[in-house]
Amino acid sequence: MILVVTLACLIAVVCCQCPTTDQGQISKVFKAYDIDGNNKISRVEGTMVFRDADLNRDGALDNNEFSSEWAFYHNDYYSPFFNVADRNHNGRIEFVEGNQGFDHFDKNRDNEISSWEFTQTWMETVRPSSRPIDF
């Protein structure tokens, strides 16, 4: 159930004002999705996050699938993340939209998101003066 939070961050945090810049919270989110504990989120782990969250197995996350996990982990902050992640505005987050978010976080393009990449991208995005980042 907790697995969709990183997907949310990977997809959406790069385009909106996040609810927190707290290092402890960022670390907690990262560790929840570093499934094998190697201090990196691989593309395989990102795919697992998406598939686990896709409860009806239709290849996309609807608002209910997204919000049930997001609300559990971040209370009421899921809505802006969903709206930004839904790049084509069809009310669903398709797998390709999830991959776009992953690519944005993977700064060195090695198909893994390090703790540093995750934290830096999150922090750059939530700065009050930051503009939305397109990916």
UniProtKB/Swiss-Prot annotation:
Keywords in alphabetical order: Calcium, Metal-binding, Repeat, Secreted, Signal
Binding site residues for Ca(2+) 2: D106, N108, D110, E112, E117
One CC-aspect GO term: extracellular region
Positions contributing to Ca(2+) 1 binding: D34, D36, N38, K40, E45
Keyword Zinc: no
PROSITE patterns xref list: EF_HAND_1, EF_HAND_2
Main localization, broad class: secreted
Gene Ontology molecular function: calcium ion binding
Subcellular location: Secreted
Tissue-wise expression: Component of the acid-insoluble organic matrix of the calcified shell.
Stored InterPro entries: EF-hand-dom_pair, EF_Hand_1_Ca_BS, EF_hand_dom
Domain EF-hand: 21-56, 93-128
Signal sequence range: 1-16
Record protein name field: Insoluble matrix shell protein 5
Naturally occurring in which organism (per UniProt): Ruditapes philippinarum (Japanese carpet shell)
